[in-house]
From Swiss-Prot:
Keywords: Capsid protein, Host cytoplasm, Host cytoskeleton, Outer capsid protein, Virion. It comes from Rice ragged stunt virus (isolate Thailand) (RRSV). The keyword Transmembrane does not apply. It is found in: Virion; Host cytoplasm, Host cytoskeleton. Minor inner capsid component. Displays NTPase and RNA 5'-triphosphatase (RTPase) activities. May function as a cofactor of polymerase. Associates with microtubules and plays a role in the formation, structural organization and morphology of viral inclusions, where the assembly of cores and the replication of viral RNA occur. This is Microtubule-associated protein VP7.
Length: 608
């Protein structure tokens, strides 16, 4: 059983606000290997360690009734601090228990229930008015018998004992103890009932997830109880053969979550009877459609949670077209023709733009927003050591810097502190610029304010960019046309060697950079650390708050259109992103820019 199902019951259907979907019919038993038994530190039963074991599963209905029984029992006991251990003993009954019943309570039961009470396995029943105890007994053992008592001092009525037996017969309970599977997800904590949390501390607890990361859908218990969600983002880049293999292997264990799935994905899902659960998360959204003016053919369509008036003011403002497009993409998500449309700054001049309000289904789902909100709350409440770090992974040209700048400015403006800024950001290119200054013996910043100026200085080239550009030149890749006439694969091996050499350098690597950074005067309490890849974060400061930013447009087209950066050509930058893309794995929780900006109440710089 698990904490969540005990707390909320297991009604079939998607749990609101999450991607959790119970199976209609769960497996009757699961087989656990030693690697599946990641025990919590509060585990009291060690008999299962290093052993392969088969356990029976409780259905959703049984877990719901059992959880309700625990909660009602605790409600009758008030705020007693000691009922958790004794209640867990009674529910598990993995060792011999002594149960003392008052004669009047026993006689009030039906004959069948009296017989049931007396025949409970692993329970010794004694009918008596009082329980004599010696002075050496612990204080909890001196609790009087009426309305009934089990060893350890917690009272339970015969009717409660009968009800529990009807829900979960003692004969069916494992002699080695009941396992409590811990989902350990921060965004689910508010759903776990306090009584279940207290009682679960005294069960054999096995973790099936880690806060800051997703559930382990390969774990036998999760695989038996829940369907694994497949969002449009998860399969958008899979070739058809790989998609077919994924659905074939996961038949009976997967479901399509939300909308925005490509027709081939829907067709493939139907072939393997994989259910599709729509997600109506917003009653209405503002839809921005781009049409070719002559044919009136839709080129792209985005939906935004911002009000129509806000979007119209943005589009009618005097901001440059490129800046308008950046804001629009950061405030919305794509709904046509794909999850990553190809957009350029000229789209406003060559297309007709139509803004409307529509009842629209959410096209993209992310599970990282609660983790970001939790991190912000921790920084403001000073519950974690300074600096509290959040890592944001995303491709080049995915608006990481734009989003973090807006968030930091808004958060600092709304949480003034006499000690300085509460929040700060470290650009994904800041490390490369620092290395450039190190190798050129330039004067390094001595305060956070000076560092912030340095990382935003476009005249300082990143050492990583310079090295990658030199590799391209060395192999004769100087013009974009060279990508059609030469084999770009020769660049990847040298990219890899240089990249690892740079980030792991003992004196100028990432660890040395962060050691220097954390010594600066005026360091904010919370830092958003940007990263291009999963590989880099192994050298970052430790944190459990790691998110992946989902780009909602084709980043390659943006790299091709935007101005070349100092120290690197467009060709080299595009090849660098090709290399980085292979080092990003969808391990961590994802988040959309529009979700972050909306929650932080960030709006475009236009007059209302």
């Amino acid at each position: 059983m698990d904490e969540l199902t005990l707390s909320i019951g297991g009604s079939p259907g998607k749990l609101a606000g999450t991607q959790l979907l119970y199976k209609q019919k769960i497996d009757k038993e699961i087989r656990l290997s030693p690697t599946d038994l990641l025990f919590s530190s509060n585990t009291v039963d060690h008999k299962l360690r290093n052993k392969r074991t088969t356990i029976a599963l409780l259905s959703r209905e049984v877990q719901a009734r059992l959880g309700k029984w625990m909660i009602s029992f605790a409600d009758q006991k008030g705020t007693a601090a000691d009922f958790g251990l004794q209640l867990a003993k009674w529910v598990q009954a993995s060792t011999q228990l002594h149960y003392y019943v008052h004669p009047a309570d026993m006689s009030a039961l039906r004959a069948a229930d009296q017989s049931l009470i007396r025949q409970l396995p692993r329970v010794t029943v004694e009918v008596c008015k009082t329980k004599k105890v010696s002075q050496t007994d612990p204080i909890e053992h001196k609790y009087q018998s009426r309305p009934g008592m089990i060893e350890g001092g917690v009272t339970i009525t015969p009717r409660q004992a009968v009800t529990l037996e009807e829900i979960y017969p003692l004969a069916s309970r494992p002699e080695k103890g009941v396992i409590m599977f811990m989902l350990s997800q921060a965004h689910l904590e508010h759903l776990i009932h306090p009584v279940i949390k207290q009682v679960s501390n005294y069960f054999t607890c096995v973790k099936v997830g880690t806060s800051g990361f997703s559930l382990n859908y390969n774990h036998p218990y999760i695989r038996a109880m829940f369907l694994e969600p497949i969002t449009a983002c998860d399969v958008v880049e899979l070739p058809l053969q790989a998609l077919h293999a994924r659905f074939s292997a996961g038949k009976g264990h997967l479901y399509l979550c939300g909308d925005g799935h490509a027709p081939r994905t829907l067709t493939c899902a139907q072939m393997f009877d994989i259910p599709h659960v729509h997600d109506f998360t917003m009653p209405s959204v503002t839809v921005v459609s781009f049409y070719a003016p002559e044919q009136h053919i839709a080129i792209a369509r985005y939906a935004s949670w911002y009000e129509k008036d806000t979007i119209c003011r943005l589009l009618q403002s005097t901001l440059p077209d490129v800046e308008k497009l950046v804001w629009l993409c950061a405030m919305s998500y794509p709904i046509f023709p794909s999850l990553r449309p190809t957009l350029t700054g000229s789209i406003f001049s060559r297309c007709k733009v139509v803004v409307s309000v529509s009842a629209e289904r959410s096209r993209l789902l992310s599970d990282g927003l609660p983790k970001w909100a939790e991190w912000v709350d921790n920084v403001l409440s000073d519950r974690i050591a300074k600096p509290a770090c959040l890592i944001l992974i995303g491709p080049k040209a995915s608006s990481k810097s734009f989003v973090t700048r807006q968030l930091v400015a808004k958060l600092n403006a709304s949480s003034l502190s006499v000690e300085g800024d509460n929040f700060g950001r470290v650009d994904s290119d800041a490390f490369g610029k620092w290395v450039t200054m190190m190798v050129s013996n330039s004067t390094l910043p001595t305060s956070w304010a000076q560092f912030d100026l340095m990382q935003n200085d476009k005249e300082i080239a990143s050492y990583v960019d310079i090295r990658f550009n030199d590799i391209c030149v060395k192999h004769g890749f100087c013009e974009l046309d060279d990508l059609r006439t030469k084999n770009a694969g020769v660049l990847q091996g040298e990219f890899a060697r240089s990249f690892i050499e740079i980030i792991k350098d003992p004196s100028c690597g990432l660890r040395a950079f962060f050691s220097w950074l954390f010594s600066l005067y005026g360091l904010p309490r919370g830092l958003m650390l940007e990263s291009h890849t999963n590989v880099e974060i192994a050298e970052y400061p430790p944190t459990t708050c790691i998110l992946q930013l989902l780009p909602n447009y084709d980043v390659m087209s943006v790299l091709l259109e935007r101005d070349a950066r100092k120290g690197i050509s467009k060709l080299a930058e595009m090849q660098m992103e090709e290399y980085y893309n292979g080092l990003r794995i969808g391990t961590y929780r994802s988040v959309l820019a529009c979700e972050l900006l909306r929650v932080a109440e960030v709006g475009p710089p236009v007059e209302g």
